[in-house]
């Protein structure tokens, strides 16, 4: 004897099963992230979800709203459904803009991108929305020069462990001398600590400033005093380094001078120094910018410049002969982070190589005379060669940006994971640090995007807490001279950057300045998008819940078993896919580690809407509410939200990522849309 179920029983059982399956589908992406290549699978799933949202919005929500509003369309001769779709699209857009205006203000961009490098003449950083050091920069200003500064640095040697380094500095006019230092597997613990300096020590800063070897105080006395004054007013931070045991292998030509320059002494961390970032021209960029105002983080200066300006090809050949110094990566992984006045510790297992230890010493000469010897080089800077880290790198042709605001209780981080994983090769930039910035995010890959040996380091020290922009990968044809009126062709330097392609494991030559304008605009968009995506899951829940509520309502008002089953099939097919898409969007919309509680609550609310709608439908049957304009209007608005999420948030982002998966993602996008097209047959 068969079991006889009433319409009410069918509704209760179906809504219960629908709730459970929808909840499971929504939280499934949380465990998907632990799979191998999880980011790739999540990206595929998100593309599929984009097709689902697009199909659901246009073929289901909009079609239903248009059908229900036809009597009013005919009566008033007006496309109400299309109006509702546009309203929903614009509401979602304006809601994101409002959130952006609250959380991403103009001074945030200025803090992230900082001032233009106004001392680097004819550079992209100077010409692209550049600002003077006294005012905030617009988005994009201060970015595009592959340089940075060590910041206010106090590097102290630990008494128990010290590096064994034999740096040499050739005299003026000699050939380049190379000193290579290789780090052994350090059994000794290594930590890097950033902490505030006592205020009563600031008065000693003036006595500790290092003056570069090639600095001519007589010619630039006023500039020097001005920079000293600014430096003295700046709140400095200490850089305290306990270095593991190193072994050194030196392969160098005979040098006519064994004198170690102040620059080299700073680089090999053999003594304690304060470093004024404005004094050295073209010294290495740093992976930690600890100056309060900060000049950003760039790459490593290493271009052996031949000043024979009559033959640029010879200059290129000289640069290519010294390209090994660009094939380096640094990986930093903090293990603890606190809030304001924080102290950050970095374990030796993650930071295997210190950026100020392994160096390539070049000629520290200010001789700008022409040279006919293409094998020799006259550099105005020391440069660094960091032994490549043996850990697997995330990328070597991409970079990321982050910001730390010391006034916040918790660090505010912007990490362009999209930019790291999916930027096309050759679009690299340095990392940008904001005011009071410390390296504190989970994992950082710094790319050597060197400026060569030209240009001052960053912008001047200033007290308006505007961080510098950081690098973007070299520059081409930059005229540099401390005295703007005396710029001449002897100072013109053409530098090249080597970008390592992790896919083909090949090295690409590229003019650093050539791609910067295009990338700056992309950077600006990325920052806005990543912030606004924080709101995306909540927008989706609202839109999905409205739709799901009326789906349940439609099922609740039915009195025929056949009609209940027809609607139930459509709801099952759509809601499970939509719930999975919601989970994917929640996981991929945030830069932070996904919270299971947040995901569960969002999916739970969405899963609960269909049963609630079904109960409401059964309660208000015959009340006349379901025949009003309210349900189709809300459905039309929800269709606009779905359209926005699909064509603005999901599809462009996913299809612009990894080009190797473009065919797979296109297929998944069409599959998601086709699935909703099939579901629409029963709706």
From Swiss-Prot:
It holds the Pfam family Zip. InterPro entries: ZIP (IPR003689). The chain crosses the membrane at residues 12-32, 42-62, 79-99, 534-554, 564-584, 600-620, 631-651, 662-682. It is found in: Membrane. Residues 160-180, 302-325, 451-465, 476-489 have a biased composition (Low complexity). Keywords: Ion transport, Membrane, Metal-binding, Transmembrane, Transmembrane helix, Transport. Residues 137-149, 466-475 have a biased composition (Gly residues). The keyword Ion transport applies. It is a multi-pass membrane protein. Its main location: membrane. Residues 120-129 have a biased composition (Basic residues). One of its GO terms (biological process) is zinc ion transmembrane transport. Residues 120-180, 299-325, 364-390, 451-489 are annotated as: Disordered. GO terms for molecular function: metal ion binding; zinc ion transmembrane transporter activity. One of its GO terms (cellular component) is plasma membrane. Belongs to the ZIP transporter (TC 2.A.5) family. May transport divalent cations. May participate, with dstA, in the regulation of the differentiation of stalk cells during development. This is Protein zntD. It comes from Dictyostelium discoideum.
């Amino acid at each position: 004897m068969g079991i006889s179920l009433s319409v009410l029983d069918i509704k209760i059982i179906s809504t219960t099963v629908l709730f459970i399956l929808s909840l499971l589908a929504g939280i499934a992406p949380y465990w998907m992230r632990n799979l191998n290549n999880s980011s790739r699978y999540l990206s595929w799933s998100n593309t599929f979800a984009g097709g689902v949202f697009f199909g659901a919005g246009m073929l289901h929500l909009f079609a239903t709203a248009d059908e229900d509003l036809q009597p009013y369309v005919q009566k008033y001769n007006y496309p109400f459904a299309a109006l509702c779709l546009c309203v929903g699209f614009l509401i979602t857009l304006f809601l994101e803009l409002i959130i952006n205006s609250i959380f991403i203000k103009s001074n945030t961009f200025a803090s992230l991108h900082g001032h233009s490098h106004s001392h680097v003449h004819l550079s992209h950083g100077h010409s692209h929305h550049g600002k003077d050091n006294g005012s905030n920069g617009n988005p994009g200003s201060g970015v595009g020069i592959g340089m940075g500064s060590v910041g206010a640095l106090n590097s102290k040697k630990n008494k128990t462990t010290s590096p064994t380094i034999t740096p040499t500095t050739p005299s003026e006019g000699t050939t380049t001398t190379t000193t290579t230092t290789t780090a052994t597997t350090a059994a000794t613990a290594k930590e890097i600590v950033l902490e505030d300096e006592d205020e009563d020590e600031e008065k000693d800063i003036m006595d500790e400033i290092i003056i570069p070897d090639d600095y001519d105080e007589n010619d630039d006395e006023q500039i020097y005093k001005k920079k000293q004054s600014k430096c003295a007013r700046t709140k400095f931070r200490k850089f305290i380094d306990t270095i593991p045991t190193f072994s050194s292998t030196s392969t160098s030509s005979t040098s006519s001078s064994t004198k170690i320059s102040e620059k080299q002494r700073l680089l090999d961390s053999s003594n304690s120094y304060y470093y004024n970032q404005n004094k050295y021209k073209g010294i290495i960029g740093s992976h930690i910018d600890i100056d309060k105002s900060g000049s950003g983080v760039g790459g490593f200066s290493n271009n052996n410049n031949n000043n024979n300006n009559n033959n640029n090809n010879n200059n290129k050949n000289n640069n290519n002969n010294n390209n090994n110094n660009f094939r380096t990566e640094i990986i930093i992984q903090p293990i603890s982070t606190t809030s304001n006045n924080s102290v950050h510790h970095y374990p030796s297992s993650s930071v295997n190589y210190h950026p100020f230890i392994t160096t390539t010493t070049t000629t520290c000469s200010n001789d700008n005379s022409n040279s006919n010897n293409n094998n020799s080089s006259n550099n105005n800077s020391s440069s660094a060669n960091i032994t490549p880290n043996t850990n697997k790198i995330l990328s070597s042709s991409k970079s990321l940006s982050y910001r730390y605001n010391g006034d916040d209780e918790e660090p505010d981080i912007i990490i362009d994971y999209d930019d790291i994983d999916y930027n096309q090769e050759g679009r690299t930039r340095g990392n940008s640090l904001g005011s009071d910035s410390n390296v504190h995010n989970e994992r950082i890959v710094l790319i050597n995007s060197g400026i060569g040996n030209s240009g001052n380091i960053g912008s001047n020290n200033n007290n308006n807490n505007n961080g510098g922009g950081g690098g973007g990968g070299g520059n081409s044809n930059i005229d540099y001279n401390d005295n703007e009126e005396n710029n001449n062709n002897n100072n013109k330097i053409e530098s090249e950057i080597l970008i390592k392609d992790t896919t083909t494991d090949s090295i690409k030559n590229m003019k650093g300045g050539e791609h910067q304008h295009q990338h700056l605009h992309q950077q600006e968009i990325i920052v806005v998008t990543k912030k606004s995506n924080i709101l995306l899951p909540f927008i989706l829940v609202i839109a999905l819940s409205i739709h799901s509520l009326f789906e349940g309502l439609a099922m609740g008002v039915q009195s025929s078993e056949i009609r209940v089953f027809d609607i139930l099939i459509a709801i099952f097919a759509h809601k499970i896919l939509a719930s999975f898409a919601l989970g994917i969007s929640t996981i991929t919309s945030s830069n932070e580690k996904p919270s299971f509680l947040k995901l569960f609550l969002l999916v739970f609310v969405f899963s609960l809407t269909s049963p609630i709608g079904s109960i409401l439908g059964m309660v208000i049957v015959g009340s006349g509410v379901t025949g009003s304009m309210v349900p189709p209007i809300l459905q039309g608005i929800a269709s606009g939200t779905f359209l926005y999420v699909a064509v603005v948030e999901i599809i462009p982002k996913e299809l612009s990522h990894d080009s190797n998966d473009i065919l797979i993602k296109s297929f998944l996008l069409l599959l998601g849309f086709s699935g909703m097209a099939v579901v629409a047959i029963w709706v």
